[in-house]
Amino acid sequence: MRSGRVILAVAAAMGSAAAVQQALTVRDRRRYPAPGLLVRTDGHQMHMHVRGADVSGPTVVLEAGMGSFSPNWHWVQQELAPTVRSVAYDRAGLGWSRRSRRPRDAQTIAVELREALREAGIEPPYVLAGHSFGGLPVRAFADLYPELTAGLVLVDASHPDQWVRWPTPYAAKILEVSQWVFGWLGWFGLPRALNLTRRVSAGLPARQAAELRAGAALPGYAATEARQIRLWSVSRAQLNAAAPLGDLPLAVLAVSKQPVGGELLTALQHELAELTESASFEIVQGASHESVISNRKYAQVVATAIRGVVQAAIDRSLKS
């Protein structure tokens, strides 16, 4: 009898939590409407936030890292706006973009990005900047669409081999399982209560930080991240088989504040700088993996690097 009452109490509590989560989700959708364009690709909605001057030259496309989406690029877009047109978008299943039935490997994400850019009327060429996990799909984009790609910027970007070489055994699997767990618990509001975006949003204005927190509280958010991690080996194979990038302008930014495995992570960033014949490499002093784009001071460094690649792309096009 006692165990039956406990089960009923737990079920009632979970039901109440789910009802509260649903009510808060409805509230958040009213409170935080999409700031950018909503386009449809292959039956699902994609969000693209365009900012900046409509000038000649490449458009900068900003790809967020694992656990984040377009508001994370607020300071970078603001710094670029006077002279460069940029678009920060949300991968399918994150932010204001709806879930895709397609697999979450780097090439598929790149194909969806190309479709969304086309539907939004954002013409090439593009300079693509990827932070963290976002480095994988922007590299896949450059491989699939070299004629559309004018340059790359990798901001403390993931290396395809990082989990194979990581000192902690099964680190990727642990991360994947944790995301699936949080995805299930998302129906009951736990990710909202824990504020899982507090690190990636630290330093952003209150509005953008709140948008990130609301987006991360959606039940499908963590499940989408888990799907990306599950197919990491597929993305790794795709990128390791990619064609050489030649003299494509490339800037690689690493950070000085690294977690466990910092020496390996910095070495991997140096390897990324060997992807092209005309790459620059810089360590952003004082920045961590998250603050390099969420902190305004460090975002200025990122924006400067992006402008440098945009100019290098323009100079390269004039020579060809």
What are these regions (language model features)?
Residues 207-285:
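Conserved serine/cysteine hydrolase catalytic core
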Residues 50-96:
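Conserved HGGG/HGGXW glycine-rich cap/lid loop of the alpha/beta-hydrolase fold
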Residues 1-47, 51, 56, 92, ...:
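Short amphipathic, positively biased membrane-proximal segments
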Residues 154-194:
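A catalytic-pocket lid/entrance helix-loop region that shapes and gates access to the active site
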Residues 73-74, 97-103, 164-165:
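Conserved catalytic-core motifs of eukaryotic protein kinase domains, centered on the activation segment
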Residues 51, 88-129:
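Active-site loop/oxyanion-hole signature of alpha/beta-hydrolase fold enzymes
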Residues 123-166:
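Conserved hydrolase catalytic core segment
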Residues 277-320:
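Catalytic active-site module of serine/aspartate enzymes centered on a nucleophile-bearing elbow/loop
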